[in-house]
Amino acid sequence: AAFAIKAREEILLGAKVNDVLVTGATGGVGSIAVMILNKMGYNVTAVSGKDSKADYLKSLGAKSVINRAEFDKDPKLIDKGLWDGVVDTVGGKILANAIVQTNSNGIVAVCGNASTNELNTNVIPFMLRGIKLWGMDSANCSIKRREFIWGEAAKLIDFNLLEKSIQTVSLEELIETYPKILKGEISGRVLVDLNK
């Protein structure tokens, strides 16, 4: 999440950005992105398949919440521009719809594939609106850059809120928890405590 947000900062270079969409917002990466973007002053719209988590997402800083069914459909060639930026953690049709709804010169930062690793889109939004699609590769980032980004992110994260979004399980409990993760029944992060 922090790497995606840093990329947005670097590429926009002071451009006016207000409305940012975060997909997979109840997940580990998405929830942190909502928190950080809100602290940076953006109007964050969260996308989630869990209507029951709207209050949770608003407590993290989302101004509004949209059900993922609005995005999980075949995209148009181009749609009304709604977002100055997007942080996508899911891929697939949700990402494709976010792309066609991105405003001129917006950036779409891709940092996950929770739904699928596929993306079927067209070139129209890129040609007509000049939007940018950036993949986040934190694995090959230098230690110096990681430390800088993590340090900046740490200033923006509410660790009390973050702690509430972490569920700790034992290795044995992970067997029961993992299918719930795959079904989208878990929000936030799951921490496996090997000493539990």
Please provide the spans of the model-predicted regions.
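Short internal alpha-helix immediately C-terminal to a glycine-rich phosphate-binding loop
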Residues: A1-K39
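Short, flexible, glycine-rich and Lys/Arg-enriched loop motifs at helix boundaries
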Residues: I11-N18, A69-W83, N140-C141, L161
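Residues at the starts of beta-strands that form the adenosine-phosphate
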Residues: D19, Y42-V44, I107, K132
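Short, well-ordered alpha-helical microsegments
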Residues: G30, A54, L95-A96, E118-L119, ...
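Adenosine-nucleotide cofactor-binding segment
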Residues: N38-K93
